[in-house]
Amino acid sequence: MTLGEIIFGRRPRPTFLTDAPADVRWRAIRPKPGPAVEAHLAQDNGFLQSPRGHMRYRAGTHYLITRQDGEQSVVKRSTFERTYRQRPDGQFEKRTDIRYRYFTLPHTVVVGTQEGPQRADAGDWIVEGVDGEVWPVKPDVAAEIYEPA
């Protein structure tokens, strides 16, 4: 126990979330047309550091995506192949005919994503994808990339 914990007590740990709570309000969304991304199938196993946590990837199982702003993410191969299409220039774009849904929570949670645990703060969107997978998105980012379906 640290001195801070002795004086102030232990900070509560965020709830670990793998499924949506039964009482959440779902909202339907779809991706907006957006800029292309670079993507390639992982050739080895590893971890990618993001602001929300470490995302693991496996050779042949995950795509590594790099957005125009340099932010990187990991997407399971089967999900990537269902939700992205390749452009003639070799880059990829998100399909806009795919529907997702999301909910928000009034408290911080750790979301169990396919790529590893990621932090979601109060008010962040927790999006459910085509395979039932969930991931957190900051509200300002979500407003840029999703629209009501």
Predicted regions located by residue number:
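A motif-centric signal for short, conserved binding hotspots located
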Residues: 2-71, 77-131, 140-149
